[in-house]
């Protein structure tokens, strides 16, 4: 099928929203997502069927092909016919490695359905559970694809009955997760049911797959599969692939079970749009109206060396055309579209227009970032935007980078800026004291891949420090009220600090409590769910990005309103670098009880207010049993039962603790937690102690206090590394 024909077909079909499906492929690392995508691409004539499965067309970064894992969420529009009708399938391949789960979160926002790929031997792994939970939270309907069924025959040598039991076991586990994380109105309908056909069994590498209804129609059963793999030549396997092509099985299921944008947006918009559902924008989105105002949700920014920044996202309403002016809600500016296109893997194909319900790539919006909402410029005064994306992990590992060749410094700074635009989970900052460029990421692999991208895409070789784990500072007790004076002694602030309880931290972290909420609504939730005093909760006036809260309990203080913005800026700055080790503060409630403000604006500028606010917060902090929090990783390890002892020995040696051990078939599953600081050589140790027979997944679990026995040692090391005085600051240092 010639390629241009497909692009034409895709563009004309995009206008009929009942013929559009937006689906993603999600899974644990190495369970076969990208291979699955390739096989689908081959079927629509985009890559040659001979190399599908090895082409890794969607893994178009060199890094991805070498490591065999997907780093970026790539997307592509496919054409597929089912029951005599043509359909457009917008397909997004998402990374499965936990270090890149930020990209998964962004992709899910634009999908209506997901193909969950599970390895038949390894079963449900941590990352499968995480992405499935995320997709159910975003109201994305799952279809199950049990991949690598050949391993049950070739490696485990199971009989047809044993194979069936194994597959049913995986289906049961997926349904348990849907039951646990799905919303009540969708649970029943979205359950995986082999008879209905929303589970596919197959092997993406060998290009065959079928659902039960398809197998019955074509007269295939598990015995045919076993025969295909036990036969002496490949002809039976090729026959199986011809009789039950995987692309037909998966895409037919997607068309049948994934809702079209008109159906999906009716129930997804109320979940992901925060704003009035009665205004014109929301109404247009609820109906996926191509003639309404434009609402374009941007989930990905890529740097194209020839064209500049390309914004990719979903058109929830309206129709994108070049020349159209859009208002960027977060950037608070308007920009004009220069070009509209759709992605066919790494290449962009130009389009005159892309209507609601589709995925589009746009040039001209270079002020946008991932998570931006772009709307028709005439609606800039209408309140609302998409709910903030919740990333499952936080950057927890940092390295300092400098170019090997000092002449490359400006080039490196520019490249780092571009990388951080493409990947919002990569944080780039300059250490003011040492002038070092610091790169923070979700894990060791995330940073390694970023450095490889620097080398390959921008030609910059860098020298790096060994990875440093990022800590947070916090407190464990309530302080008294301290007075903070401004340097000119004309302004005074009376502040105290106390730790936030776990429930409050959870509500802020998962986005239930937001700074921009109605104060009464916020107070009601905090009172009912986190035991706050209602009146105190109503007076929260700021929440920063590290889950700290500022409460204003003053009444009738003269001139306070005029300087309140400066006070809050002082609070945010103080929270960025705590007194213990200049690490960010987390989980602290700062209460302003009273203040004295000078009447003359000349005497109450930022240079006076910032130190006064900071000093009283820090004095309180140091008297409240301060501590450091370290990032903890959750491990999910599968290992033959006789090697459990070897694995637990490695974990306990690394200050880890075992949470659970269970038996699945002939493997044991160990769930454990271990500090990120101890995980640096974890992979090689696990491999060494199990002779390479353990496979595992990791994900960020939580922040936990560093044990008191090593606290001082850790603080001293961080202070030394940052060039700070060895001795810790005292309360008196902040009280002048």
From Swiss-Prot:
Location of this chain's protein in the cell: Cytoplasm
Gene Ontology cellular component list: cytosol; ribonucleoprotein complex
tr-type G domain span: 18-234
Source species of the chain: Saccharolobus solfataricus (strain ATCC 35092 / DSM 1617 / JCM 11322 / P2)
Homology family: Belongs to the TRAFAC class translation factor GTPase superfamily. Classic translation factor GTPase family. EF-G/EF-2 subfamily.
Chain residues that bind GTP: 27-34, 93-97, 147-150
Record's function text: Catalyzes the GTP-dependent ribosomal translocation step during translation elongation. During this step, the ribosome changes from the pre-translocational (PRE) to the post-translocational (POST) state as the newly formed A-site-bound peptidyl-tRNA and P-site-bound deacylated tRNA move to the P and E sites, respectively. Catalyzes the coordinated movement of the two tRNA molecules, the mRNA and conformational changes in the ribosome.
Coiled-coil stretches: none
Gene3D superfamilies assigned: 3.30.230.10, 3.30.70.240, Elongation Factor G (Translational Gtpase), domain 3, P-loop containing nucleotide triphosphate hydrolases, Translation factors
Keywords for this protein: Cytoplasm, Elongation factor, GTP-binding, Nucleotide-binding, Protein biosynthesis
Pfam families reported for this sequence: EFG_C (PF00679), EFG_III (PF14492), EFG_IV (PF03764), GTP_EFTU (PF00009), GTP_EFTU_D2 (PF03144)
Diphthamide PTM positions: 603
Record-level Gene Ontology MF annotations: GTP binding; GTPase activity; translation elongation factor activity
The UniProt record lists the keyword GTP-binding: yes
Biological process terms in GO annotation: translational elongation
Official protein name in the record: Elongation factor 2
Predominant location: cytoplasm
